[in-house]
């Protein structure tokens, strides 16, 4: 960044002096975490050309909230406001619209919605909330339908959407929310739809419901209060015998001075058919337990935002990854966390003890009575007795909570959505890769090494308006992540390997999708070939892979420059040598020749080195980055003069050279004028101004003690006698004898003014 232009007189040097004296010490450090959790190594701002992105939008459409990937991975189905779209995502770049079918709310429903005091500009529409693949020929969709939920089947023909028939639209109550702002979830399992949403217009009746298929329709019982009235559902994940629902609600088992929100996981059995006499058309296998995501000794992250399942070869080792925030703000900022929960731990908790409500004390305690058979939530095939169902009605809350493993904790950010995949490195090890959408429209790519905490590879600002990410859909076959926003859909390639221009930078990135190809000398997407590519996911140290091996390893070794940029000095000017900060995790310093430039003596502005041409300033200047214990030159300059050229160091003879122009700032006249000019006036002016500054500082320091002394004097003067009257008011009045006046503390107001009240 170029400096402001300086004048042609002695004031030029004064401005340089004050620039160094006042501005440079106030600049923020180049890097550092500041206790906010892991920092993204690379950050891309909105519109940055170094990160290839593509954006799909359709005129007249808003709220691209619901995303569904086809079975072959080539089509992305999108549920927007009053429309369903089919996008072709086979080719890189902007997704291509295959076709679109409208599904607006009827005019009658919109009129009724407005009559109920809802906005006909933002609320009384059909927001698509459920979009699942029913079979090879049909999709199943549900929407808010102007606060009157509706569902329908959408026929497919060669992945194209056929128009919706009005007579095929069904009641969607219990499957889609009434209000578009209410959270919801739905999953299709074995032809049956399991949904969690709000079941009434007011949004005060949460429900878990099963519809479609051959099994009877089942739902939770609102009168038994299995769910709190403010329950908010975020995910539904099927397992072998059960379906898990993830949600948050106000806790009823804790006595707290304020409402405490708790994240939960609930289960229902797939083979549940309801009760015969008790709990007819109701779940008989409903259980719920608390989810705990917290660091030791810290407040828990108690509000769940999203959850996904990462399948494994064995279901017993599969894990659920969930995003949490906290209802408390520590340090005035929001925080987020990602925790992993084992399916084995969830199953163990649901096989443990129950809690029961003591009706006398209205407190939840551990149930210590005898077990009933069949055990509630056991998914037994036989019918349950009335005794077992009666027990189940009151014992639906588990005593133990499911403890998650914190993988990523970061303050100053609110994660809203999550997508997870497993990536295999060159060494064959598997690494969890998480894509995290934020409330400000950015996307974080995080990697979880084996038995370690996550680190952030990059941060990409998608939305220029900082609006939240509404949905994420991973498309592994296309190597991309799709992010839904109110105005459209962003396509984000899941890796950006080409931005790493050297083996050092490629290895330090520790991106499992990228590796260095020594033949093409490019950082490229990792393929299934067995080429001798370079990658170090475990250590991320270029000394092990970018050199000939561990024998060449040296703890103080610095790699040679790959390119030297030649710069010619100009008399009477300030030379600015820029240093691009490729990594936010590195620390940077400048060196001149083989010596490190002291930070105290160097003039560095925003990472750039400022040089005033004079004798001895020529030669090799390098901006050196140190990351993960490894130092490497980010940029190298050979500063030379036209009048007195320097000979290049023989060790740098084989390094390519390039003549470049760098920013210059004029500070004086010609060379001959500068040589004849005396700097005595400059010294006097600087000395006088510095004395004025010091005098002002001393005045400020002395002002506070003097003010305190004056205030003390006013307080001490409050006890003085008031002046006597010089003459009586009338002839009948006589002078009263003098009394000893004493003033109480209450006789002095906040401004040390005497109130005139006397105390005998």
From Swiss-Prot:
Membrane-crossing segments per the record: 683-703
Domain Ig-like C2-type: 572-630
Domain Sema, chain residue ranges per copy: 36-494
Tissue: Expressed in neurons and glia in the developing hippocampus.
A GO biological process held by the record: regulation of cell shape
Endpoints of the signal sequence: 1-32
Pfam families per record: PSI, Sema
Chief localization: membrane
Known role: Cell surface receptor for PLXNB1, PLXNB2, PLXNB3 and PLXND1 that plays an important role in cell-cell signaling. Regulates glutamatergic and GABAergic synapse development. Promotes the development of inhibitory synapses in a PLXNB1-dependent manner and promotes the development of excitatory synapses in a PLXNB2-dependent manner. Plays a role in priming antigen-specific T-cells, promotes differentiation of Th1 T-helper cells, and thereby contributes to adaptive immunity. Promotes phosphorylation of TIMD2. Inhibits angiogenesis. Promotes axon growth cone collapse.
Protein name: Semaphorin-4A
Gene name as annotated: Sema4a
């Amino acid at each position: 960044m170029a400096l402001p232009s300086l004048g042609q007189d002695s004031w030029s040097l004064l401005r340089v002096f004050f620039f160094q004296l006042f501005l440079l010490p106030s600049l923020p450090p180049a890097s550092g975490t500041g206790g906010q959790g892991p920092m993204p190594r690379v950050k891309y701002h909105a519109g940055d050309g170094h990160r290839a992105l593509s954006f799909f939008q359709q005129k007249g459409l808003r709220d691209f909230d619901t995303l569904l990937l086809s079975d072959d991975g080539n089509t992305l189905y999108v549920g927007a406001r009053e429309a369903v779209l089919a996008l072709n995502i086979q080719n890189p770049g902007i997704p291509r619209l295959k076709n679109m079918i409208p599904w607006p709310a009827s005019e009658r429903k919109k009129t009724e919605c407005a009559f109920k005091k809802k906005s006909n500009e933002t609320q009384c529409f059909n927001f698509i909330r459920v979009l699942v693949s029913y079979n090879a020929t049909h999709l199943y969709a549900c929407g808010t339908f102007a606060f009157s939920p509706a569902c329908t089947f959408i026929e497919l023909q060669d992945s194209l959407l056929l128009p919706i028939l009005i007579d095929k639209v069904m009641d969607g109550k219990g499957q889609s929310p009434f209000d578009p702002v209410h959270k919801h979830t739905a999953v299709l399992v074995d032809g049956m739809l399991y949904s969690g949403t709000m079941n009434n217009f007011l949004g005060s009746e949460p429900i878990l419901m099963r519809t479609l298929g051959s099994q009877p329709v089942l739902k939770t019982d609102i009168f038994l209060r299995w769910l709190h009235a403010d329950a908010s559902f975020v995910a539904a994940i099927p397992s072998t015998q059960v379906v898990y629902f993830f949600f948050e609600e106000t806790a009823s088992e804790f006595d707290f001075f304020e409402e405490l929100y708790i994240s939960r996981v609930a289960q229902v059995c797939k083979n549940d058919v309801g009760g015969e006499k008790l709990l007819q058309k109701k779940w008989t296998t409903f259980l719920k337990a608390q989810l705990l995501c917290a660091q030791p000794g810290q407040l828990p992250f108690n509000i769940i935002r999203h959850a996904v399942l990462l399948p494994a070869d064995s279901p017993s080792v599969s894990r659920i990854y969930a995003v949490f925030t906290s209802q408390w703000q520590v340090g005035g900022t929001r925080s987020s966390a990602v925790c992993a929960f084992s399916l084995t731990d969830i199953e163990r908790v649901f096989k443990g003890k129950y809690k029961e409500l003591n009706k006398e004390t209205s407190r939840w305690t551990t149930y210590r009575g005898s077990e009933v058979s069949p055990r509630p939530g056991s998914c037994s095939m036989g019918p349950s007795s009335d005794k077992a169902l009666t027990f189940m009605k009151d014992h639906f809350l588990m005593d133990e909570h499911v403890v998650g493993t914190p993988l990523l904790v970061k303050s100053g950010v609110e994660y809203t959505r999550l997508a997870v995949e497993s990536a295999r490195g060159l060494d064959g090890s598997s690494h969890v890769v998480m894509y995290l959408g934020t409330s400000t429209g950015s996307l974080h790519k995080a990697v979880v090494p084996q038995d370690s905490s996550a680190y952030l590879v990059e941060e990409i600002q998608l939305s220029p308006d900082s609006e939240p990410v509404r949905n994420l859909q991973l498309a592994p076959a296309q190597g991309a992540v799709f992010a839904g926003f109110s105005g459209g859909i962003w396509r984000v390639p899941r890796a950006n390997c080409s931005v790493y221009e050297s083996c050092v930078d490629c290895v330090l990135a520790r991106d499992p999708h990228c590796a260095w190809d020594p033949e093409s000398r490019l950082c490229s997407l990792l393929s299934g070939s067995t080429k001798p590519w370079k990658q170090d996911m475990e250590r991320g140290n270029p000394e092990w892979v970018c050199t000939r091996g561990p024998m060449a390893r040296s703890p103080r070794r610095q790699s040679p420059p790959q390119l030297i940029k030649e710069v010619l000095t100009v008399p009477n000017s300030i030379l600015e040598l820029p240093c691009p900060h490729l990594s936010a995790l590195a620390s940077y310093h400048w060196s001149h020749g083989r010596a490190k430039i002291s930070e105290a003596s160097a003039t560095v502005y925003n990472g750039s080195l400022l040089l005033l041409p004079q004798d001895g300033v020529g030669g090799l200047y390098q901006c050196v980055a140190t990351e993960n214990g490894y130092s490497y030159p980010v940029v190298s300059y050979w500063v030379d003069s036209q009048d007195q050229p320097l000979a290049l160091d023989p060790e740098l003879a084989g390094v390519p050279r390039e003549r470049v122009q760098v920013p210059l700032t004029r500070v004086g006249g010609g060379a001959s004028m500068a040589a004849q000019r005396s700097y005595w006036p400059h010294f006097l002016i600087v000395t006088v101004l510095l004395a004025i500054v010091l005098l002002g500082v001393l005045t400020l320091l002395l002002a506070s003690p003097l003010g305190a002394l004056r205030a003390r004097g006013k307080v001490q003067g409050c006890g003085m006698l008031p002046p006597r009257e010089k003459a009586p008011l009338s002839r009948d009045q006589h002078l009263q004898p003098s009394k000893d006046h004493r003033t109480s503390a209450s006789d002095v107001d906040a401004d040390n003014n005497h109130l005139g009240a006397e105390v005998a």
